Amino acid sequence: MIYTANSSPSTNLQWLSTLNTDDIPTKNYRKSSIIGTIGPNTNSAEMISKLRQAGLNIVRMNFSHGSYEYHQSVIENARESEQQFQGRPLAIALDTKGPEIRTGVTKDDKDWDVKAGHVMLFSTNPKYKDQCDDKIMYIDYTNIVKQIDIGKIIFVDDGVLSFKVLEKIDGETLKVETLNNGKISSRKGVNLPGTDVDLPALSEKDKADLKFGVEHGVDMIFASFVRTANDVQAIRDVLGEKGKGIQVISKIENQQGVNNFDEILKETDGVMVARGDLGIEIPAPQVFIAQKQLIAKCNLAGKPVICATQMLDSMTYNPRPTRAEVSDVGNAVLDGADCVMLSGETAKGTYPIESVKMMHETCLVAEKAIAYAPLFNEMRTLTVRPTETVETIAISAVSASFEQQARAIIVLSTSGTSARLCSKYRPNCPILMVTRNAQAARFSHLYRGVYPFIYHKARASNPAEWQHDVEERLKWGMDEAVALGILNKGDVVVAIQGWTGGLGHTNTLRVLECV
């Protein structure tokens, strides 16, 4: 259904009351992007192409695992797959390991049983690094004794084991009480909920990984455990001039990140609500609130936001998801997430293609439940004025798309900014971005509703040829959309462009007919 910004329904509740389970969404246009983690089961050009056909937009590499040779093979396979879909970009994301705390290695690398109520020691003394047992366990965070308070809880192995701090024995030793039965194993992750961790933003491994990403042309960084705006700047410093076009997406995974979110949002290019570690660092029911809060703030700022972790987790080993998982994906879309992410489902799962298809179908249905006109009016009302010229044009384009009942907004873009700002105001039609900037085309998959196309024909060499070049790009973009089934001949299209080439010149809006 298409409606104008001033027509009914005037509220979200009215729109929801008109939904019909018999309505089948179109299969050729999904606004939300899908991120898939590539693992051993999916690391081939053939498999990545199959995932793309199922709906994949962004390839994720998890640098907590795998060698540089392995990750290079993922990049090569992704680029080979991209070539099979001429003009349609595929983005590549590098997910950093980030600052993390781990236990040491147990004696003989065996598991040691512990019972609730058992009292033992945690030590930062390196002599216990490979001598852990049920009496003493090494922790590789030197400042843990200084930073943690008595009475605080320490989680080990994603919360499988929990301990309460009883006493600070000395500058490197804690006495703790085991709160549940379990096993002490080697090299398990440690979480300190409610404790400010002063680890450096980037380890030496992270710095090397970022430099690898720059050299191999990744499009975005998923930066783990971002706690302050300074963490984002530290990443940009490592990326340097050569990597200045790489988007930095800050993963919010602990209370510090939530507390400092406003300053992080100003500095970062986008955000990931990483619910796994976040659900350990803060009470699990509060993750629900954090997800809605962080997504809303990103929407208001016009910055892309990803919802991640366990979205279709049961599909790792089952052909169908639980109903709760489907609702989780759908509600993330309703919350305002630009992208949804698959982890183990595609990295190691038995049903990677089915997982992407299910994500695709769920997003399609969820997007029908959004009242776009009331949402646009709310976003426009909340916009701080005066706006920059490019944002004014974006607002006008989205407004015109409602009033003209347009089937698409087509954006001629250099940097992707105008497409991102159109996405901010959530039109109910696709945003077709035509650009010569391959990197901008790829990372524009982060923005909801944006369909990026890479235009390969050379730029006009003089101002006299500029308008002819504009008309050629508009016609080419519409032809590509017709070929994909997004547009039909005769459809109304809103077009925005610059008065000349280069960055920051977007100031022109037109209403066209697809011919």
UniProtKB/Swiss-Prot annotation:
<feature type="binding site">
    <location>
        <position position="309"/>
    </location>
    <ligand>
        <name>substrate</name>
    </ligand>
</feature>
<feature type="site" description="Transition state stabilizer">
    <location>
        <position position="251"/>
    </location>
</feature>
<feature type="binding site">
    <location>
        <position position="95"/>
    </location>
    <ligand>
        <name>K(+)</name>
    </ligand>
</feature>
<keyword id="KW-0324">Glycolysis</keyword>
<dbReference type="Pfam" id="PF00224">
    <property type="entry name" value="PK"/>
</dbReference>
<feature type="binding site">
    <location>
        <position position="276"/>
    </location>
    <ligand>
        <name>substrate</name>
    </ligand>
</feature>
<dbReference type="GO" id="GO:0016301">
    <property type="term" value="F:kinase activity"/>
</dbReference>
<feature type="binding site">
    <location>
        <position position="253"/>
    </location>
    <ligand>
        <name>Mg(2+)</name>
    </ligand>
</feature>
<comment type="pathway">
    <text>Carbohydrate degradation; glycolysis; pyruvate from D-glyceraldehyde 3-phosphate: step 5/5.</text>
</comment>
<feature type="binding site">
    <location>
        <position position="188"/>
    </location>
    <ligand>
        <name>ATP</name>
    </ligand>
</feature>
<keyword id="KW-0630">Potassium</keyword>
<dbReference type="GO" id="GO:0006096">
    <property type="term" value="P:glycolytic process"/>
</dbReference>
<protein>
    <recommendedName>
        <fullName>Pyruvate kinase</fullName>
        <ecNumber>2.7.1.40</ecNumber>
    </recommendedName>
</protein>
<dbReference type="Pfam" id="PF02887">
    <property type="entry name" value="PK_C"/>
</dbReference>
<feature type="binding site">
    <location>
        <position position="102"/>
    </location>
    <ligand>
        <name>ATP</name>
    </ligand>
</feature>
<dbReference type="InterPro" id="IPR015795">
    <property type="entry name" value="Pyrv_Knase_C"/>
</dbReference>
<feature type="binding site">
    <location>
        <position position="96"/>
    </location>
    <ligand>
        <name>K(+)</name>
    </ligand>
</feature>
<keyword id="KW-0670">Pyruvate</keyword>
<dbReference type="InterPro" id="IPR018209">
    <property type="entry name" value="Pyrv_Knase_AS"/>
</dbReference>
<keyword id="KW-0067">ATP-binding</keyword>
<feature type="binding site">
    <location>
        <begin position="62"/>
        <end position="65"/>
    </location>
    <ligand>
        <name>ATP</name>
    </ligand>
</feature>
<dbReference type="InterPro" id="IPR011037">
    <property type="entry name" value="Pyrv_Knase-like_insert_dom_sf"/>
</dbReference>
<dbReference type="GO" id="GO:0004743">
    <property type="term" value="F:pyruvate kinase activity"/>
</dbReference>
<feature type="binding site">
    <location>
        <position position="277"/>
    </location>
    <ligand>
        <name>Mg(2+)</name>
    </ligand>
</feature>
<feature type="binding site">
    <location>
        <position position="277"/>
    </location>
    <ligand>
        <name>substrate</name>
    </ligand>
</feature>
<dbReference type="InterPro" id="IPR036918">
    <property type="entry name" value="Pyrv_Knase_C_sf"/>
</dbReference>
<feature type="binding site">
    <location>
        <position position="64"/>
    </location>
    <ligand>
        <name>K(+)</name>
    </ligand>
</feature>
<comment type="similarity">
    <text>Belongs to the pyruvate kinase family.</text>
</comment>
<dbReference type="InterPro" id="IPR001697">
    <property type="entry name" value="Pyr_Knase"/>
</dbReference>
<feature type="binding site">
    <location>
        <position position="62"/>
    </location>
    <ligand>
        <name>K(+)</name>
    </ligand>
</feature>
<keyword id="KW-0460">Magnesium</keyword>
<dbReference type="InterPro" id="IPR015806">
    <property type="entry name" value="Pyrv_Knase_insert_dom_sf"/>
</dbReference>
<comment type="subunit">
    <text>Homotetramer.</text>
</comment>
<dbReference type="InterPro" id="IPR040442">
    <property type="entry name" value="Pyrv_kinase-like_dom_sf"/>
</dbReference>
<keyword id="KW-0808">Transferase</keyword>
<dbReference type="GO" id="GO:0005737">
    <property type="term" value="C:cytoplasm"/>
</dbReference>
<keyword id="KW-0418">Kinase</keyword>
<dbReference type="InterPro" id="IPR015793">
    <property type="entry name" value="Pyrv_Knase_brl"/>
</dbReference>
<dbReference type="GO" id="GO:0005524">
    <property type="term" value="F:ATP binding"/>
</dbReference>
<dbReference type="InterPro" id="IPR015813">
    <property type="entry name" value="Pyrv/PenolPyrv_kinase-like_dom"/>
</dbReference>
<feature type="binding site">
    <location>
        <position position="60"/>
    </location>
    <ligand>
        <name>substrate</name>
    </ligand>
</feature>
<keyword id="KW-0479">Metal-binding</keyword>
